[in-house]
Structures are given as C-alpha cells and as structure tokens.
Amino acid sequence: MLGTRRLLDGIVKTTVMVMIGFCAVGMGGVGEEKLTKIPEPDDNFSATLIDQRDVSSHITLFSLEGQTFLSGKRGGAMVSIPFGNIKEINFYARGRDIFAMVTMKKEPQVELEMEKDRVFYGQLSYGLLSIKVEYVKKTTIHSLAGQER
C-alpha cells in the first residue's frame, strides 16, 4: 500500500511538472504585439533602413514614434534634428549605449546618444515596419513624398 502511494505521488508530481513546462513554453510569445497600424507622421518621408543583420527595407511614412525628427543627447543637451535636414544616419554601440552619427545635407556631422528602446516606424510596399533604435544599423532619408532630393 505504501509503495502504491509513493508511485501515485511520483506520477502526480511528474504530471504537474510537465504541465508547468508546457505552460511556460506556451507563454513564450506573451508580450509580443502584432503590428496592425503605425503612427501617422505629419510629413511623409521615404527612407531606406538597414538593420543590424544587413536586411534593407525601403519605407514611406518613416518616423521615430510618429515624429519626423531625430532626437538624442549631445553632451548635456537634448537635440532634435528635422528629417528634412538629414541625409544619412549611422548607428553604433559604444559599451551599452547606442549612438547615431548624423550626416546632414548642409551642415557637418553630428553625433547623438540615442535611447535604444525608441522605435522607428514605416510603411513597406507589402506591410508595416517597426524596429527599435538599437537594431538599426543605417538609415538613408530620401525624400518627402512628392519631392525629390
């Protein structure tokens, strides 16, 4: 009788552990949201964005969280640069921080320290795009819709 009780306890414990394992695996996608819409910026910039895996995407309605300017720290100051003034942005890590080397259309380059959790959005020819700043390698801003640069 005592042996049967131990056997049943072992089966119950094993079953509970297996169920917990399945639940934990099944919850792996929790927190990941589907992208069904993007913030619509005031101006429609087109851009080519290359991520850290060298995947290139041509996008329209390009924005940084709905805004058409790049904001970051320069020394102790916050700086915002309108997309219309920017030719190209190269992102790189220095330690745990993310920096952007901004090539301007008419001014010298400017380096900004970025908040890596901020998100770029855009419209692809086949869908929508969102990507955190920390996963972007390079962005080239081409034009405002209807205008060639």
Predicted regions and their residues:
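Compositionally biased alpha-helical segments
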Residues: 28-149
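Bacterial N-terminal signal peptides
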Residues: 14-24
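Bacterial N-terminal signal peptides that target proteins for export
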Residues: 2-16
